[in-house]
């Protein structure tokens, strides 16, 4: 797959996750650039159901845009960049704001697997907190 095909699939992925209501207006999907694994593609800050190929931006693994072309990027791009940087085997990421999980996140409630098929997770569900990497209140845009 080349970069152009990856961008086309990324546009379709955005539309599909929106249509299936897997993300709301604030969720997003990214894909690693197959021609340069040190970069990834992500749409500009826009509802996934509206994304077109012209909305796709490229970022390095520090989440620095290659060329913004006057568009505003998602602030959450840092989550994606950190995942791609730490996991070279990851080729795509979908981030959403699961309303069912938000109360657990803001109250620091430990999430535990409740089904036998989730036993591979361990005793607690791992949580990645952006503050551990970027601190509180620091603006990165």
What is each PLM-predicted segment?
Residues 1-141:
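Glycine-rich flexible loops
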